Amino acid sequence: MAGHRPGVRGTAGHRACARGRGVRGGSPSVTEPPPTAPTTAPLRIGNASGFYGDRFDALREMLTGGPLDVLTGDYLAELTMLILGRDRLKDPVAGYARTFLRQLEECLGLAHERGVRIVSNAGGLNPAGLADAVRALAGRLGIPVRVAHVEGDDLTAAHPGTLAAHAYLGGHGIAACLRAGADVVVTGRVTDAALVTGPAAAHFGWAPDAYDALAGAVVAGHVLECGTQATGGNYAFFTEHPRARLRRPGFPLAELRADGSAVITKHDGTGGVVDLGTVTAQLLYETAGARYPGPDVTARLDTVRLTQEGPDRVRVEGVRGEAPPPTLKVGLNRLGGFRNEVVFVLTGLEVEAKAALVRAQMEDAFAVATCRPRHVRWELVRTDRPDARTEETASALLRLVVRDPDADAVGRAFSGAAVELALASYPGFHVLAPPAKGTPYGVFEAARADQGAVPHLAVLPDGRRIAVGPPADSRVPDAVPEPPLPAPLPPGPTRRAPLGLVAGARSGDKGGDANIGVWVRTEAAWRWLAHELTTERLRQLLPETGTGAEGGTGAPGLAVTRHVLPNLRALNFVVGGILGEGVAAQARFDPQAKALGEWLRSRHLDIPETLLDTPEALGGPPDDPHAPPDDPHAPPDDPDAPPKATPEPPPTATPESPPAATDPPEDPR
């Protein structure tokens, strides 16, 4: 991409540039470019990171794999902010994702050579520090790049007792930096989608109230933000694709247009797959209802239309936008105390009696200890099987987790009590690992702050500081009434089978809550799912939601909310409080609810036989001449597996024209 194009690319393609890693030594000469002008030419924007720790080579893969205008990297999650906060306690100049710098050391020259601008939230808690580090790196490599950053999200001083308190900013600060000619923009805490809305707003010259276009970019950004989850990673129907294609999925990119519509795709020749299912799964991930609020716009997920445009190309269009809420989300991270755990292995017969004995023994130890842990949680996991052929499959696990503000309460006294039972407890006593010292854990909470009270600043390459004001208009994102459901399927024979034979799912965490997005791929399956999978049925299938997060008998059920999205043939469930105080508290076996959806898919219920006798329910890996070559030393794929069926394209709908209850539903997501 050496030629000049208007928009966010500015004059990068015309500059003299270093090859590969750049020319070492000397101070690069950075010329002052003219402000970039908006354009209607499509914007090709890719993502090379879905989390701090993602594939290191992805930045280079995306730069060399095909044409790009902008390359983003998402490094921040709720847990990451806590980790960076602890880093900053040890070193005040830390607080950003150092991996990003190592990636730039290898790829900054390549990006400059190709005229690709880089936008990343790797700045974490210290975007100014990362911007300085990038400038120093560029100077050492002799690469004349212009670096800008976005700040103002840090509200820690206003929240005493927190390790890090950061508002989720929007994309307009990023846009200001790009309009000023920045080649690299680093931010602190912005919404994940802002990494796309910012470049898009700069490229197309969108006004702050271009809500439909901004909403389209938000949806595209949400699909891209988790990297390979949009290209076949963590995908419910993964067995329908050849194993060779999924071994190393390529990272996604979006071809954005001036109206906010986009095509989700990936570089030619890379692994993975982009189809209606992979895009739908990611759209449902960590969202909730029809309104998806953000700092710049509230996107209406019930207006999204998806179309399979061709191999590995899904068009996203029709997205409507509304004025953003008057407040910003603020993530509060604090140290919650100290935790420790021990897992007792209970093998063979009388598992319940063995569990009762060791539990009583540990409770006796707590009773005589100088300080009983404030929180004690027992969990018996029945992984054992009768008449098992291996010792592992004959064993159940009894997990004991303790937490307390005082490290001593979960330290040596706790460890010693468990160790002292080695010769004095149930037959076959042993633990998975020797008890260790207590470790600190974090707590995440979400708060709100008025948009006008957060000093959103774009710090341009020349050092000027541009204030980004709050939106001129705002709207509280009230819940959307449930749309009419499709006509139910006529009565017929059913068969007891796992839900996952006909439905996909993806789940994730937001603070202490979890969401489970469930979707189907045919109109008949949607007519069944919309009526069958109610909140009551979900509670039956996932008993943990009905007995409280601690699993105690008689505990009140967790709040479960169902959102209906006919345009995606999907239901999105939000389970409140199932993760306790968030992922860092490690209060649950699966602390980020990553597999909650797969548990749901594994549960059996009565499914119409007409849905089970379909290619979708029988799926298997198809022969694919476009798949990358397989590893010659790997076991072959099943040659007898049935081919994948082409799913029906979903119908379309808008909030203004809901489907009639007796007609096939129109897709609101």
Positions of predicted regions on the chain:
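C-terminal non-catalytic interaction/assembly regions of soluble proteins
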Residues: 319-496, 510, 515, 519-526, ...
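An acidic, phosphate/nucleotide-engaging active-site surface
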Residues: 154-187
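Catalytic or ion-translocation cores adjacent to nucleophile or general acid/base/metal-coordination motifs
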Residues: 140-152, 198-238, 531
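A conserved active-site cap/scaffold subdomain adjacent to cofactor or substrate pockets
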Residues: 214, 219-315
